Amino acid sequence: FLGDTRPGAYGRAVDRLLSSPRYGERWARHWMDIWRYSDPSGFQKEIRDSRKHIWRWRDWIIDSLNADKGYDRMLTEMLAADEAAPADTAALRATGFLARNWYKFSRNVWLDNIVEHSSKAFLGLTMNCARCHSHKYDPISHKDYYQLRAVFETHNLRDDPLGQTDSSAIMVRAFDSEAATPTYLFINGDVNQPDKDIPIQPAVPRILGGKLKIETVKLPPSAYYPALQPATQEKALAATDKEIKKAHSAIQPAEGNLEKAKLTLSKFTPAPTGKKVTDSNSKPSPPQP
């Protein structure tokens, strides 16, 4: 920039920076903090329930910023891409905002999280208090809270596990209580009354793109036993070495104290032959010269 002395240097620098893919990555970090994006979710053992494909939402945020997509359109896609653009697989990634809050053990927790995160991110309000009572100092009533939550009540999330590869069709089969039970495509409407006229074949969701090829991978023992990994062993050895050095440093003053005790003991006069000093309180020792 400093070397460009031609007129319009500032505008060219701005255009160059805005056209860089790094622009979307830089500002996506800001918006992902507001929209509460994270690769893992949960605490301790709950980490295992993290959304495995949540990174697709992250990429959608970056792509949207680089494409200069309008803020209103981004909000529409995050909250209702499955309704606003059901055939747009790129836009469907935006619904990661809703999936990010999913809590498999309680639907109420999930929906309350959606309301909380939506109000904070898009309205600049905290509506948590209104979940149980009308807000004390903000104009948000108990009724307002559940009217907003009602918007998300019909939303549901499928997290079916995918099984092994079907070698004949090279497709993934979803395990169910009955493997032969047909699967029907649910687009919208009442989930309890699906259209059973057109069954669909088991396959990878189209949004994931391509075919999922599963191959057997032979892993070393360290993959099953983390304690065998070099980094873990080095850490354990370093901790043990530290304890050994600490023990050695404690032995040195103890040895010095032992020598002092021996020297002090040697100054005492030995007891006369046949007369021993007793440490019994019931039998006093004979007088010593």
Locate each region found by the language model.
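Substrate/cofactor-recognition hotspot
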Residues: 1-20, 146-289
